[in-house]
């Protein structure tokens, strides 16, 4: 149960909150995700994330998040058909990507811009009825892999590849990115990574989405706000730095000296620690398995051994376990995603979780309006200032 609201007529003063950054503050009730931080457990709609990642199809879990129940075979087929019909990007998006799909433009800025453009092109964007929001969500979910893949190719000076109507959602992602049909184990690996990144309760980007849609702004504005939050290095942006870090270290035997220097310099290494999980991130072990299998035939197989050594060193020296970004970065690199697209990849799968929260917020909406503890001066007079003229 959320705390009682502070009366707006009373100045908010007094002791500081128990934790900065709203640590431990319950902002809403939700039936989407349960995180047990001390135990290192994660559940989507009551299902353990380990079970979903190992046995479910990404689109099955999307349906679960959006509708609160497992899809029937007929519902799953219908969902696939709707996505297949909407995967192609509008011509206006291709025009914009020709302008901003360049190496000097931050990929997340491009994804943010195109998402906003898609909202401007959607004639029902301002309709907040559940059916209208779901229609917009299906269209955006279908197009996100197309967008990220097209952006990646434009940044390399290559033409985008149209989706293959014979391929499913996950397989098409790799096909559009690389130009060749993926192997089955690659599809399985990417499916696992997408499930593990698709939702994570009330993190900064999800809270941003719920706050925006709580004002009865439109679906695309809420998703764009979430993308803006995810872009930050303290949130999703950290994943982009993992592979460059491992490449810089180079060899497993170089890890101890590298970590010692980094800690002496006060550096924080990406991929370690989490605000909620103190003992272990349940997603990390599953992603380590994906990374190990995919890296066995990747161009840089030695990176996995560097990662294992670094994980052990950080746990011994700092007590910090690997988080969701760490091995996901290795898995994505092995699949052909360049590091600068890793955060954009998260957008393409996390849009499912953001949408679930947007739907839940709209179903029982109340404007999100917290208060601040005032710590400044009071009772100042303009007349007391020597520079003030009457």
Regions found by a protein language model. Give the residues of each.
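Hydrophobic alpha-helical bundle cores within soluble ligand-binding/oligomerization subdomains
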Residues: 2-390
